[in-house]
Amino acid sequence: MRNRPRTLVALLVTPVVLLLAGCSASNLPRLGLPEPVTDNGHRTLALWQGSWVAALIVGAFVWGLIVWAIIFHRRRGEHIPAQTKYNVPIEILYTIIPFLIVAVLFVFTARDEAIITKISPKSADVHVIHVNGIRWSWQFKYEDLPANTVVTGTPDHIPTLYLPLGERVRFDLTTTDVNHSFWVPAFLMKMDLIAGRTNQFEVTPDKLGTYAGKCAELCGRDHSRMLFNVKVVPPAEYNQLLNTLKGSAA
């Protein structure tokens, strides 16, 4: 009987230790998310971390109360303790606290969502790239190039989308058939391509590299092969690429 509290603590702590053992020191602060490579990605990561902190605080408090009740208020003998019901102050407290928690999470989420989905005015210096989903690949058209300059991929030939480092980019998302979803995990951002409408979002890449992208909406037979790459390059290299594409389309 005396070892029961220790056993209970061990049962609670062991799963947490095993879970943390699967994370490296560099990955642990991100709590399962990849390292962000855009300005909006850092904001998404901060929101994710804040939500986890709130969840852990609430969870620790609730589990603490449960363990406290199990250890110090377990039933002893045949004595039945006083039964408490219809306690209006406690019921009000149980209603207000969850409401406040949800309200705080909502405020921060709404604030960050408004920033992440904000579109720059037409007068702003923004690179516009039209992304069209097709079964089962992608078409990329850079607005700075002639209309007939379209990079089209296939399930066997994965297309590459080039972005300039440190410069604002807007994606105009459309589909010519079924619904798809444009997802680059390193962006910490996913947006659907819905038939009959154009969805938009903007990012500013802040890290050079090549990042995998994919369709995140089940769209048919070759959905799993609907892949693409995103390569973030220096602005000079990006402009050179556009000139090369323009020359090949001439």
Model regions: which residues?
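N-terminal secretory/membrane targeting signals
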Residues: 1-25
